[in-house]
Amino acid sequence: MGLILMLICAMMTSISIVREKETGTMEVLLVSPVRPLWMIIAKMVPYFVLSCVNLVTILLLSVYVLHVPVAGSLFSLALLSWIFIVVSLLLGLLVSTIARTQVEAMLFSGMVLMMPTVLLSGMIFPIENMPLPLQLISNVIPARWYIVGIKKIMIEGLGISYAQREMGILMLMAVVLLIISLKKFNKRLE
């Protein structure tokens, strides 16, 4: 679930600002009184709604087709997932501020984000069995913290208080990604 959400979110948002630059509408946005923060938030909102629809679809398929039990609270699961969706969207927007073309943005978000997410998030290989350098690198992979939190809530049936650490780390990642995206966006404006 973490891989699908991250890839869909990052790929959707990674082309948003690049498309504005390629079509020439970025110049119109730049002369408007809209601040870069509000521009980034406005880019995220529709993709957040689409990602929530994806989340519901994934959960319904997991429960009713694959018979994955949800032992914990659906609210806790949704809250953790919403935070992860925001982090993934901000990651895609960061890619969008760096990339020059839509193809470059899609390739970067597809390949560069997918490989570390698959290999270092704990989704396939247990983090405890990885060499220490890879364990340290896995700490900056948002999907790692999402997967750990999802296991606690969905499989172990623990409450939201047991996933506070993971939620805090994901929120910190969101703030850092937002600050970096704003700086990159402002640098691009100059």
Residue ranges and their predicted role:
Residues 1-13:
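Long, hydrophobic alpha-helical segments
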Residues 11-32, 44, 190:
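Transmembrane helix boundary and interhelical loop/hinge segments in multi-pass membrane proteins
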Residues 23, 31-37, 100, 159:
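Juxtamembrane helix-boundary/capping and inter-helix hinge elements in multi-pass membrane proteins
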Residues 34-61, 78, 82, 167, ...:
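Selective transmembrane-helix segments that form parts of the transport pathway or gating/packing helices
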Residues 59, 69-190:
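Membrane-spanning alpha-helical segments of multipass transporters and channels
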